[in-house]
Amino acid sequence: MAGKRRRSSKNKEKKEKGIPYFDYNLLFIVIFLLCFGLVMLYSSSAYTSAIKNHDSMHYLKLQIRNIVLGLIPMVFLAKVDYRYWKKLGFFAYIVSLILCVLVFVPKIGSSSHGSSRWIGIGPIQFQPSEVAKIAVILFMAMIIDKIPKQFDKFLSLVKVLAMLIPLIIVVAISNLSTAVIIIGISVCMSFVASPKYLQFIIVAVAVVVFAVAFVMLAGYRSTRIEAWLHPETAGTDAVFQTMMGLYAIGSGGLFGKGLGESLQKLGNVPESQNDMIFTIICEELGLFGAICLILLFILLIWRMMVIANNARDLYGSLLVIGVMSHIAIQVILNIAVVTNSLPNTGVILPFISYGGTSIIFLMAEIGLVLSVSRGIRLENV
């Protein structure tokens, strides 16, 4: 027995040998996106912020605070061995489910724009749906890592995805777009474990049916669909926001009007610092600036693919795939909405749009990815 233990410890040491690795490329891309986001946030919000808050730097100051707060979990998670979180996957899922339910409890949950999405504890407000995204990543990575071979069976896939139904339903009641993102994350992680096309086509059809059912049940969502299909005749605020956003994109031309020179941000594009910030980027920096930003996101996704492909174990690879899926889906949804390719959903642009909870948890997810990258060992040449 002692001999076996010595051999296993030697094998472990052998596996750990090699040059320690840390993906500074990923870190620099994230830092650049955050800095670029601060510049565009100030540009898009200075006018309305000066009128509403008597301080043109109001949103900029809050975003800097959010980024500083986000650095704490990012650095912490980057330094802690990611394998530690494997045993907390189910706990994270249950906590996120409870938090999402608390949104509907009077005096705890708070509403904005007709949706209950926040929990208020004194002066602090946060979105439990952001907690749910990272919780689902941890939960799915844990489950798939335990039964990787069983994912070849369709029934096993259905059972795992069925475990997420309570959380998806609770989130979808107040925030359908986040529910779609959670489903997308789960499906992408499952597809990596078992890339069988037929079973995922069946799941995709089920998701579409689920989304249509929720749209039909909620009147304001069906109104958004109608406004999306006929924006020129509908008279809702969402249509006005979309139309003004399209004007901003169209007026930017190839190279834009110049940084800070947007006209649509002067009260014409509502929430220009949030989910519509991409329209201001297009107006001020033009098609060239928009393409550069999209390429930067593609570079970010590519770095994550490299880390996932070289992770030391399946669990680490799944964590990175989950974060990568989250960011990719959110970028696609945001750009699709502002170009009127999809109905208005309120999905923000990662690292660029103004947001408290979203920025903090996005940076926490980046910390997880960096932790996985630290586990990679380069071969000695």
What does each model-identified segment do?
Residues P231-N274, F278, L285-G289:
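TM-adjacent membrane-interface loops and short helices in multi-pass inner/ER membrane proteins
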Residues E13-E16, Y47-M57:
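Short helix-coil transition/hinge motifs at the ends and kinks of transmembrane helices
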Residues N175-I181, K257-S262, S272-N274, I291, ...:
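Transmembrane helix boundary and interhelical junction motifs in multipass membrane proteins
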Residues G18-P20, T48, D152, S156-L157, ...:
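Helix-boundary and loop/linker segments of multi-pass membrane transporters
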Residues I31-C35, S43, K52-Q241, T279-N340, ...:
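Hydrophobic alpha-helical transmembrane segments of multi-pass inner membrane proteins, especially
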Residues M1-P20, L41, I332-V381:
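A juxtamembrane structural motif centered on a specific transmembrane helix
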Residues M1-Y42, A193, V205-V212:
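Gram-positive cell-envelope targeting signals
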